[in-house]
């Protein structure tokens, strides 16, 4: 997320590294300069700091994001608050447009106010700024963060920016005090899996019109609580989170916490490494073999916590249809729509991408924005439990055009590579 509407990097031509792999530092000072996810050019993520002096933190920062989270190294903090919003379950009118070669953003319309609630960790003045979803160059590795070297196909970010009209209030729960001052942003990250079962038929254009205006054919998936008639996971009928259907995940009866755990996409190698998080610079790059812990994911039977803090993955049906319909719409999908004054109006609840309230265990650390200018003023709240959307969402997002020639976001993705920072990560669960 960025506070700026960036130019397209191709508007000013493309630069390439010299024979020594070095890109010249430009004298540009614009904070809205264009940037790319093409890793072979000087506008790409490894060289963002050379594009503009405003982007210098991208190259020399001390708390850059995203990171690989090593679950057993994260420090448990007993008093970390539950993640909530005020007002609760508020449906917002948002507008989404084509963001060129970047992830489309759902931005609240004027007058729409929603705040993140993390009592004692931050004050109550962080206002909803946008929702966006990152994807990768491959279908399986699209999340920006990873846990123990494992990625998911996408990662949703709910971005909150501190209200400029209010003063920062002191926090009661400090995260080690390594970085003085206040964080301008709170960003909630959610790992998104994809699946086929239980998401119904592909919505047609007429159905999409109704869905984007907030009309859904059945009960709101954010319902009346984990055990109410409609439950937070109302997608599975009247039984809510504790209903008969539960959630069995991609692997049938085993679910995300079953024998197979969650194996991520590409195993143990992280972005570039031959040994997962411990390498990060080795031979196999995106296509490693087994994952740091072999066959059993973090939440599998042999995972870090087994069933004690297991995750029941929510099938986010309504979020799926909203994202699918939005990404398919011409105003978002077509590059030629960039700059048009009228975007696509979408009604959504920012809680839709989140796990059920009782499963909102999270990791938190002080990092940065993952796009230029890579501002180091972000409190990250990365959800441990995953959420599942339909495979059609991933397909639709990857087919959004990011270039004048019709090249889509599938070519370079919209994920920044893992950063090698030694930041301290805390967690709300044992």
From Swiss-Prot:
Residue span of region Disordered: 201-312
Pfam families: Carb_anhydrase, Collagen
Biased composition (Basic and acidic residues): 207-219
Gene3D superfamilies: Alpha carbonic anhydrase (3.10.200.10)
Protein's job: Acts as a negative regulator for calcification in the shells of mollusks. May function both as a calcium concentrator and as a carbonic anhydrase required for production of carbonate ions, which are assembled to CaCO(3) at mineralization sites. Is important for shell formation in both the calcitic prismatic layer and the aragonitic nacreous layer. Shows inhibitory activity of crystal formation when present in free state but, when attached to the insoluble matrix, may regulate the form and size of aragonite crystal.
GO molecular function: carbonate dehydratase activity; zinc ion binding
GO cellular component terms attached to this protein's record: cytoplasm; extracellular region
Domain of life of the source: Eukaryota
Entry-listed glycosylation sites: 27
Family annotation (InterPro entries): Alpha_CA_prokaryot-like, CA_dom, CA_dom_sf, Carbonic_anhydrase_a-class, Collagen
Enzyme class: lyase
Annotated Alpha-carbonic anhydrase domain residues: 33-429
The name this protein goes by in its record: Nacrein-like protein P2
Reaction(s) catalysed (UniProt annotation): hydrogencarbonate + H(+) = CO2 + H2O
Necessary cofactors: Zn(2+)
Biased composition (Low complexity): 220-304
Keyword Glycoprotein: yes
Binding site for Zn(2+): 132, 134, 157
Keyword list, A-Z: Calcium, Disulfide bond, Extracellular matrix, Glycoprotein, Lyase, Metal-binding, Repeat, Secreted, Zinc
Other facts: Two hypotheses for calcium binding are proposed. Either the Gly-Xaa-Asn repeat domain bind calcium or sulfite and sialic acid provide the necessary negative charge in the N-glycan to promote calcium uptake.
């Amino acid at each position: 997320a960025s506070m700026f509407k960036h130019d397209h990097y191709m508007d000013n031509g493309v630069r390439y590294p010299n024979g020594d792999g070095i890109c010249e530092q430009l004298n540009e000072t614009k904070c809205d300069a264009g940037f790319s996810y093409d890793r072979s050019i000087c506008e790409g993520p490894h060289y963002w700091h050379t594009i503009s002096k405003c982007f210098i933190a991208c190259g020399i920062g001390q708390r850059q994001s995203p990171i690989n989270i090593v679950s057993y190294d994260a420090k448990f903090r007993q008093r970390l608050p539950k993640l909530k919003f005020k007002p609760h379950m508020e449906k917002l009118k948002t507008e989404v447009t084509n963001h060129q070669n970047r992830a489309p953003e759902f931005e609240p319309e004027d007058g729409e106010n929603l705040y993140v609630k993390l009592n004692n960790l931050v004050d109550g003045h962080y206002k909803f700024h946008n929702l966006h979803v990152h994807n990768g160059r491959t279908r399986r590795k699209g999340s920006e963060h990873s846990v123990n070297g494992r990625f998911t196909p996408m990662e949703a970010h709910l971005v909150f920016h501190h209200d400029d009209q209010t003063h920062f209030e002191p926090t009661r729960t400090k995260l080690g005090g390594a970085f003085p001052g206040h964080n301008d942003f709170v960003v909630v990250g959610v790992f998104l899996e994809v699946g086929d079962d239980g998401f119904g038929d592909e919505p047609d254009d007429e159905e999409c019109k109704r869905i984007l205006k907030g009309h859904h054919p059945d009960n709101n998936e954010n319902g009346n609580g984990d055990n109410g008639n409609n439950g937070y996971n109302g997608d599975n009928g009247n039984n809510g989170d504790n209903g008969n259907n539960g959630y069995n995940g991609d692997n049938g009866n085993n679910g995300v916490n079953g024998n197979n755990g969650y194996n991520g996409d590409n195993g143990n190698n992280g972005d570039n490494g031959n040994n997962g998080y411990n390498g990060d610079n080795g031979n196999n790059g995106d296509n490693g073999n087994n994952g740091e812990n072999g066959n059993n994911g973090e939440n599998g039977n042999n995972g870090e916590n087994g069933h004690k803090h297991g995750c029941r993955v929510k099938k986010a049906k309504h979020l799926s249809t909203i994202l699918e319909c939005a990404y398919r719409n011409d105003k978002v999908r077509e590059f030629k729509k960039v700059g048009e004054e009228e975007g696509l109006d979408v009604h959504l609840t920012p809680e839709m991408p989140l796990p059920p309230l009782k499963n909102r265990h999270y990791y938190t650390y002080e990092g940065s924005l993952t796009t230029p200018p890579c501002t180091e003023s972000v409190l990250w709240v990365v959800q441990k439990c995953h959420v599942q959307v339909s495979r059609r969402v991933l397909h639709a997002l990857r087919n959004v055009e990011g270039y004048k020639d019709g090249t889509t976001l599938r070519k370079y993705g919209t994920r920044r590579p893992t950063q090698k920072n030694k930041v301290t990560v805390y967690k709300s669960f044992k």
